[in-house]
Amino acid sequence: MMREERLLKVILAPHVSEKSTNTAENNNTVVFKVAVDATKTEIKAAVEKLFEVEVKNVRTVNVKGKTKRTGSRFGKRSDWKKAYVALNEGADIDFSGGAE
């Protein structure tokens, strides 16, 4: 069993984009921005504990940071990890937080 402290550090934020909205509506899948060193097992445990839902499976993607230019200097944004969390039938996570 993982420590609760670690589970709280695994999920950083929900990832909201056009693609993630479509997958949420069509495939009952939620997309999260997660810690780079997080494993699929940790992500599954964290989502089940924090949102009290049943997780079907977890798929992860390492996203490479973009190269950006400011004047004559080049820099690079940090790499990050994205997790597609498929929920069981009937399970739902509401991020609107009661907004009407």
From Swiss-Prot:
Query: Which NCBIfam families does its entry note?
Result: PRK05738.1-1, PRK05738.1-3, PRK05738.2-4, PRK05738.3-2
What keywords is this UniProt entry annotated with?
Ribonucleoprotein, Ribosomal protein, RNA-binding, rRNA-binding
UniProt GO MF annotations: rRNA binding; structural constituent of ribosome
What protein name applies here? Large ribosomal subunit protein uL23
Q: Say if the entry is tagged with keyword Transmembrane helix.
A: no
Organism the protein comes from: Idiomarina loihiensis (strain ATCC BAA-735 / DSM 15497 / L2-TR)
Q: Which GO terms describe its biological process?
A: translation
Q: Name one Pfam family in it.
A: Ribosomal_L23
Q: Which domain of life is it from?
A: Bacteria
Family the entry assigns: Belongs to the universal ribosomal protein uL23 family.
Provide the function of this protein: One of the early assembly proteins it binds 23S rRNA. One of the proteins that surrounds the polypeptide exit tunnel on the outside of the ribosome. Forms the main docking site for trigger factor binding to the ribosome.
Tell me which Gene3D superfamilies the record gives: 3.30.70.330
The reply to whether RNA-binding figures as a keyword in the UniProt entry is yes
Q: How does it assemble?
A: Part of the 50S ribosomal subunit. Contacts protein L29, and trigger factor when it is bound to the ribosome.
